[in-house]
A protein has these predicted regions:
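N-terminal targeting signals for export/organelle localization
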Residues: 1-46, 177
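Short gly/ser/thr-rich secondary-structure transition/capping motifs
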Residues: 24-26, 46-53, 121-124
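A generic structural signal for alpha->beta connector loops
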Residues: 37, 42, 92-93, 118-119
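A short beta-strand-turn-helix
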Residues: 43-66
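Hydrophobic beta-strand anchors of alpha/beta hydrolase catalytic cores
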Residues: 66-67, 95
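Aromatic-flanked redox-active Cys/Sec active sites in thiol-based oxidoreductases
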Residues: 68-73
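Structural microenvironment flanking redox-active thiols in thiol-disulfide oxidoreductases
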Residues: 78-115, 125-131
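Thiol/disulfide oxidoreductase modules built on the thioredoxin-like
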Residues: 112-117, 124-175
Length: 177
């Protein structure tokens, strides 16, 4: 019994160490989404003032496209914006946007300063649509297939590595289906 009491703390320490090290094998950006391979949630967002088109679930069928959730107050959104712009400019994929919990005048000023690569922008003033999409924070980007199903989600800012290594190959695959 005495021997067990001396060995027990050591076993507990080793067990905690193994559990801790296993955590390093996981990608902290991988946040599971229950919406992967499911149809986009039903929604219909009005456009930002001065824009012709908002974004609705019906718009997300027929072509492979991205939906980017952004806000003018979001610092990582500014960092990823050139990447989103390059994706849209080179006709690689249409990009629609959900402007999350933002003042319209701030969003418009941000787009005027940084450029507007979006096919359409829906104003989600109260954040309700983002909740339905399972958004944890901004930015987040979703890849939508031709049938209007969410096929991939990037929580956090896009990076060239994510675009080249994951998004573009998946776009090519979805377009060939």
């Amino acid at each position: 019994m005495r021997r067990l009491i001396t060995i027990l703390p050591l076993l507990l320490f080793v067990g905690l160490g193994v559990a801790f090290l296993r955590g390093f094998d996981r990608d902290p950006r991988e946040i599971p989404s229950a919406l992967i391979d499911k149809p986009v949630p039903e929604f219909d967002l009005p456009p930002l003032p001065g824009h012709k088109q908002g974004v609705a679930s019906a718009d997300l069928k027929g072509d492979v496209q991205l939906v980017n959730v952004f806000a003018s107050w979001c610092i990582p959104c500014r960092a990823e914006h050139p990447i989103v712009s390059r994706l849209a400019e080179h006709d690689r994929v249409p990009v629609r946007a959900i402007n999350y919990k933002d003042k319209p005048e701030d969003a418009l000023a941000w787009l005027a300063k940084n450029g507007d690569p979006y096919t359409a922008i829906g104003a989600d003033r109260d954040g309700r649509t983002a909740i339905d999409w399972g958004v944890y924070g901004v930015p987040e980007t979703f890849l939508i297939d031709r049938q209007g199903r969410i096929r991939y989600k990037v929580p956090g800012p896009l990076s060239p590595a994510i675009v080249e290594g994951e998004i573009l190959p998946l776009i090519a695959k979805l377009r060939s289906e």
